Amino acid sequence: MMEFIKNSAFFGAMISLIAYEIGLILKKKFKMAIFNPLLISIICVIGVLLIFHIDYGDYNEGGKYISYLLTPATVCLAVPLYEQIHLLKKNLKAVAAGIFSGTLAGLCSILLMAKLFGFDHQEYVTMLPKSITTAIGMGVSEELGGIVTITVAVIIITGVLGNMIAEVVYKIAKIEEPIAKGLGLGTSAHAIGTAKAMELGPVEGAMSSLAIAVAGLLTVIGASVFAGMM
């Protein structure tokens, strides 16, 4: 069995897909935010690796093929935006202000947290790209001297939390405007948040897709500036 895992180029991909399918089944059955498919799949994969003492390198021989699809999948998010382009043109100033303020708030929150908890410089820059998609965040972290593997974990946690609590936050804050919901999810919770935005509606999904791209670009620029503040 272990020899098959070590020599298989598809074991990692297979176990990842099965784990995600389990997450989807649980979400449909219980309809609760805690049963997020991505969160469930992460727990399942980690559990399998620990129980059967499978080395991460062996798992990643197949798992990396799913990672390769991350960038093209992000690019495909332009499709819903194109379908709602008329809304973007009509609300351009509000959209730009929303994404800019959301990105700035995210960077400021990390700076405040770093000072509050006494992070060193490497820990600080590792956290800076927390709200942007993994494909961009890994590059930002590496460029600034952060720990890329931890950056990836932080990005995933941020996205999952955003996905889980978005509807609760919107309900408490009485936010009902679809454009605002989409921008909030895309700016703060990247692609994972966008998955939730698409569940909420086509306008939310389109605005969230736009927010991912613009917030990513702003964070690349802003992170370089904020990195020098600690």
Regions found by a protein language model. Name each.
Residues 40, 98, 154, 210-211:
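Hydrophobic core positions of alpha-helical segments in small-molecule transporters
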Residues 57, 106, 122, 163, ...:
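Short, electropositive, low-hydrophobicity segments enriched in small/polar residues
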Residues 81-160:
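Internal active-site segments that recognize and position negatively charged phosphoryl groups
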